[in-house]
Design a protein with these regions (language model features):
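Alpha/beta hydrolase fold serine-hydrolase catalytic domain that processes acyl esters and thioesters
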Residues: 2-7, 13-26, 30, 150, ...
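C-terminal catalytic-base region of ester-bond hydrolases, centering on the histidine
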Residues: 179-246
Length: 246
């Protein structure tokens, strides 16, 4: 699926936003599908995976996702930087150090999984250090238009408040493809981020994969976890487009 050519994208309908937290609670309670998935998902090779949380969330929010990946034999790690309050003057340096230290410790490339705003960070890390990144997976990340969310006013990097020229430059920069194998996971029923703002320009080693879940539930929804497990299991140099398992 190719992304739209629109310059701006509106947030999701209010009807989805109102239902968001209730849907996420139900998705978290559905333990059965996640347990079943552990029996069928491809096993990992033990390589390191950094998981970056969304806005106003921290490592606590990614425990289910990291626990799932560890059960598949990955060395899944949180970012260890507390609550994600948005970009700060020191955050980029801390993230650079985290990635490079992890790469050096394991002596192998690192996969990045970023949820929502965490996916923006992950994309910029991969852009800056492509030789240290094995693959990039984003969950409900609005890199095509950071303002296409119901929390955009909380994010300092939003285009709003800038001149039209500066806002256009920021959007154009964030949506530029990253030079590593990239999978963008999106949901058309996302109540926080408009799904069209998550669409990658498809091309070699770039893809969009649709799931059916809430934004807040992406990190523990079985369908999302299945995609993440499949993408991480690909051998280096043998990337292929996602094909849903029977």
């Amino acid at each position: 699926m190719q992304p739209p050519n629109w310059q701006t994208i509106s947030p999701p309908p209010l009807s989805l936003f109102v239902l968001e937290q209730g849907r996420a609670a139900l998705e978290l309670a559905r333990v059965g599908p996640r347990r079943k998935l552990l029996d069928t998902a491809p096993r990992g090779d033990g390589h390191p995976v950094l998981v970056l949380p969304g806005l106003l969330a921290g490592d606590l929010s990614t425990i289910p996702l990291r626990g799932f990946l560890r059960a598949l034999s990955y060395d899944a790690r949180g970012w260890g930087l507390g609550v994600n309050v948005g970009p700060t003057d020191t955050l980029r340096t801390k993230l650079d150090d985290l990635l490079l230290r992890t790469r050096e410790k394991h002596d192998q490339t690192v996969s990045l999984v970023g949820w929502s705003l965490g996916g923006i960070y992950a994309r910029e890390l991969a852009r800056a250090h492509p030789d240290s990144v094995r693959c990039l997976i984003t969950l409900g990340t609005p890199f095509r238009d950071i303002s296409a969310t119901h929390v955009a006013r909380l994010v300092p990097i939003r285009p709003g408040g800038r001149s039209l020229r500066k806002a256009h430059e920021l959007r154009a920069y964030l949506r530029t493809p990253v030079p590593v194998p990239t999978t963008s996971i999106f949901s058309k029923t996302d109540g926080i981020v408009h799904w069209q703002s998550c669409l990658e320009m498809e091309g070699p080693e770039r893809e969009n994969v649709e799931v059916a879940c809430s934004h807040t539930g992406m990190g523990f929804h079985a369908e999302t976890l299945a995609v993440v497990a499949d993408r991480l299991a690909q051998p280096i140099g043998k990337w292929r487009y996602y094909a849903k398992r029977a």
